[in-house]
A protein has these predicted regions:
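Structural motif
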Residues: 20-22, 103, 130-135, 159
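A short, gly/pro- and small-residue-rich
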Residues: 141-162
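Short, well-ordered secondary-structure micro-motifs within conserved domains or adaptor modules
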Residues: 126-143
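Active-site phosphate-binding/coordination module
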Residues: 46-124
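Catalytic-core regions built around general acid/base machinery
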Residues: 36-48, 147-151
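Short acidic low-complexity segments
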Residues: 9-11, 119-130
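Single conserved hydrophobic/aromatic residue that forms the stacking wall/gate
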Residues: 163-174
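Asp-based phosphoryl-transfer active-site loop
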Residues: 12-33
Length: 174
């Protein structure tokens, strides 16, 4: 069945109680706010709508993102920012025993989230991790990538938080 969205004259804050807003390109672009985004968010909050923020960026702490949003004049607590690191750590924790070893390749935020779920962060395949979580990390080395490969080859669950772009005429993704 193909459902069509219907238009309405009612403000969105009267139709929905919660807005999950993507950050990158919706609320801000890099360090700069998207024009009118903060005003619209404040209006929705004044009308009683709860606002939460989501991002697939695994490299920044929730508190850092919340601070940036407060700089735009928004009332935001870190718990209102849902990063891919938060989701990944919780997801893996549901699929492995408490205290399980997890090889983490990513920013400190990702490592902290995994440890915060009661899991043991390791750096080497020889530590026999039950899972691997790889986030965006521009400082990763060939050795770290090799450790990820070895762990996955040995049967570790693999979760990547890295966005793979859609192929274009110039891209080849295998």
């Amino acid at each position: 069945m193909n459902a069509m969205l219907k238009s309405t004259d009612r403000p969105i804050s009267q139709t929905y109680r919660l807005a999950l807003l993507d950050l990158d390109g919706v609320v801000y672009r890099g360090k700069n706010p998207v024009e009118h985004a903060a005003d619209s968010i404040r209006a929705a909050q004044r009308a009683g709508m709860q606002v939460e923020y989501t991002t697939n960026n695994s490299s920044r702490f929730q508190r850092v993102v919340a601070e940036q949003l407060r700089g735009f004049g928004l009332d935001v607590e870190p718990r209102q920012v849902i990063t891919s690191s938060v989701v990944a750590a919780r997801m893996v924790a549901r699929h492995v025993p408490a205290g399980a070893r997890i090889l983490v390749l990513g920013a400190e935020h990702l490592r902290e989230e995994v440890a915060g779920q009661g899991l043991t962060v390791v750096d080497h395949a020889e530590d026999t991790p039950e899972a691997v979580i790889q986030g965006w990390y521009p400082d990763m080395t060939w050795q770290q990538m090799a450790e990820v490969s070895y762990a996955v080859e040995r049967g570790a669950l693999y979760l990547s938080l890295i966005h793979i772009p859609e192929p274009t005429r110039l891209d080849v993704i295998s």
